[in-house]
């Protein structure tokens, strides 16, 4: 049986038929491959591949890598290469380090890099501050508006009712009709007194039944009464400043002025603390818990260097131990047999160098069977080229 030896670097002397398509390999065999054992082949690889062996790949960028540990920070010099067991891969990229082991993943980034996203390894670990506390409105101020509404609003409402009755009794005084003045002409004692009575009644009702509807109604009417009291103060001061008003009329207006001032103050106080109590009720059960989360420096899911979807991926990346350009199983130069592929027959569509699937020379099945004789005729030329380019392997048969 004649054995045919074809070099993978270049075969310029082969005479092939017209229907044979020759494809040059993308990664030529480095010079000196005849000195390697028959089971290992050396390739001219990119700077990111330090060493390629069967079942192992070590991919790293040549720069200093810092690794954080519990004891301290360890730095690795430029070009440092760690040895990993067969079946594992070590990928080192910028700005982090990916170290793959069987069943575990450890991602480490540069210390102090604030732009890198934080990462939990192996899971989220949070450390709560020792000063966890549950607070309400009473924690911020010593005054409780809800307690004020429950205890004091009833008294303030009763005072408002009395002030309103005082204004109404002043409005029905028959003496005022003989001496007309501004307070009487404006009708302030009547509509002011009614407003004060309504707001005071709602305040007393809100103290007994603090439902949202009643409380909101009481706050609204107290705001309206405050506006009426302010208007009444302005009317009374105007009446007291006129010179033609009689002394009796000024006495009546002067008697209403303190009540108007008191009503204005009471309605403002009740409205303010009523609104504050309503807002406090909405946030009464809110717990304020200051929590500090502590993370490991890198993120296994969202980091730019991701073991599954990141730019440096051991399964689908351009430098892959299974289907990348540096492939130990389906590369044009097969590493499992020998750097120089030896065939058992001149033309073999399955294991020979003229292979339509994995061989460096792409030949279709039909034309190869019809051109057996020309392929045998070029055996001597192939051997001559092999002698000039690549020295024959002592283990091959002649």
From Swiss-Prot:
Transmembrane segments: 156-176, 178-198, 218-238, 251-271
Organism: Homo sapiens (Human)
Low complexity composition bias: residue spans: 332-346
Pfam families the record matches: CD20 (PF04103)
InterPro entries from the UniProt entry: CD20-like (IPR007237), MS4A (IPR030417)
This protein's name: Membrane-spanning 4-domains subfamily A member 18
Gene Ontology BP term (one): cell surface receptor signaling pathway
Keywords: Membrane, Transmembrane, Transmembrane helix
Compositional bias ranges of the Polar residues kind: 319-331
Subcellular location: Membrane
Region: Disordered, residue numbers: 316-346
Entry similarity comment: Belongs to the MS4A family.
Lineage of producing organism: Eukaryota, Metazoa, Chordata, Craniata, Vertebrata
Membrane topology, from the record: Multi-pass membrane protein
Cellular component annotations (GO), alphabetically ordered: plasma membrane
Cystine bridges: none
Domain of life: Eukaryota
Main localization of the protein described in the UniProt heading: membrane
